[in-house]
Curated annotation (Swiss-Prot):
Protein name: Conotoxin ArMKLT2-0211
Pfam assignment, any one: Conotoxin
Organism, as annotated: Conus arenatus (Sand-dusted cone)
Tissues showing expression: Expressed by the venom duct.
Predominant subcellular localization, coarse grouping: secreted
């Protein structure tokens, strides 16, 4: 009975730690889905042509290397 309680508390503690870590890493720009996808696609044979900042863009084509904000490529 004691072992079962200890295991339940340990699982709940580890689950809470995972949820806390997931919430903290969500807002980091260096781990965004777009950057992860670009990292997988950028090999020696694939080169991506990026639009310059403040160029017109849309969400479907995604030619901006950063983000498309209000139909304009952003800086950073």
């Amino acid at each position: 009975m004691k072992l079962t309680c200890v295991l339940i508390v340990a699982v709940l503690f580890l689950t809470a730690c995972q949820l806390i870590a997931a919430d903290d890493s969500r807002d980091l720009k260096r781990f965004s889905r777009r950057n992860m996808r670009d990292g997988m696609l950028n090999t020696k044979n694939t080169k991506r042509q990026c639009l310059p900042p403040l160029s017109l863009c849309n969400m479907a084509d995604d030619d901006c290397c950063n983000d498309c904000v209000l139909f304009l490529c952003s800086y950073y």
